[in-house]
Amino acid sequence: MFAKQIDIHWQKMKGIKFLHWLLGTVLLWVSLSTPALAIPALDYNPWEAIQLPTTATILDMSFIDRHHGWLVGVNATLMETRDGGQTWEPRTLVLDHSDYRFNSVSFQGNEGWIVGEPPIMLHTTDGGQSWSQIPLDPKLPGSPRLIKALGNGSAEMITNVGAIYRTKDSGKNWQALVQEAIGVMRNLNRSPSGEYVAVSSRGSFYSTWEPGQTAWEPHNRTTSRRLHNMGFTPDGRLWMIVNGGKIAFSDPDNSENWGELLSPLRRNSVGFLDLAYRTPNEVWLAGGAGALLCSQDGGQTWQQDVDVKKVPSNFYKILFFSPDQGFILGQKGILLRYVTDLTAAPA
């Protein structure tokens, strides 16, 4: 009888242990499968969605003044606005074919430039009423990736392999600013003062260049995650976006030192594509699947603009031409326009 009671007690103990194990397993599974708590929602939406009269992807935009601007994109897409970007009208150029990818457009006053690939360069001095094609050297390293209008016939061009050139005579002659290219780039950004930062095609390293240097300076990435995009903060630091939905900012005193990786969305399922400052403290971060976040403290804490999640587009590029004029470029002819009378954000 005593042995039977021990056996019954032992069976009960095993049953309790099994229940504890089962409960622990269920709790672990729930904790791993439940997404992290969402970040706070932005209590206003300053962005208006615009569907352009095209399904082409838009790659760049530039304004002559607050009202008159131009945008460019794939399939030789060229459009003009005269109402600050509320409406856009297609413009057609007589080219040898329509497969050009217009990568970049830039205006300084009425003088403007467009570059793209296969290698092509267009120039206007009358605000875009007429465009002339500038011949490019067949030996040009790579294809034009970015153009910056500097005014009075001057411009700076960089190719997709990092060759930098400057003209002072409306494109008749070009001076090389670096001795050699750096290879194919994934992303490229220029600071207002003329510095460049470029991410390598594989995201394994980045390179920087400052006016006066004759060569790019390579830098190893400081994280095991691959780099996606990099750019400049208003105070001259660098920011980076890496795979997995994380960002980081360089140290104010040493650009080689970086702060910790931040996860603005608190999960790794969204890839961010671009970052831009509206003011010295207000930062916008855009990415895939309609992801759009805003920080009011320079990128330390974030809120999500949930109203734009219904827009069926990835957001590739953020452009602010002033604190109250900005655009976000999407896919299939979709834009977001910053509308000041919709926002309660601080200036």
From Swiss-Prot:
Keywords, in A-Z order: Photosynthesis, Photosystem II, Signal, Thylakoid
GO aspect biological process, one term: photosynthesis
Subcellular location: Cellular thylakoid lumen
Keyword Thylakoid assigned: yes
UniProt keyword Thylakoid present: yes
SUPFAM superfamilies: Oligoxyloglucan reducing end-specific cellobiohydrolase (SSF110296)
Domain of life assignment: Bacteria
Pfam families: PSII_BNR
GO CC annotation terms, alphabetical: photosystem II; plasma membrane-derived thylakoid lumen
Signal peptide: 1-38
Homology family: Belongs to the Ycf48 family.
Domain notes: A 7-bladed beta-propeller torus, about 54 by 46 Angstroms, with a depth of about 25 Angstroms and a central pore.
Role description: A factor required for optimal assembly of photosystem II (PSII), acting in the early stages of PSII assembly. Also plays a role in replacement of photodamaged D1 (psbA). Assists YidC in synthesis of chlorophyll-binding proteins.
Protein name stated in the entry: Photosystem II assembly protein Ycf48
Lineage of the species this protein comes from: Bacteria, Bacillati, Cyanobacteriota, Cyanophyceae, Acaryochloridales
Name of the encoding gene: ycf48
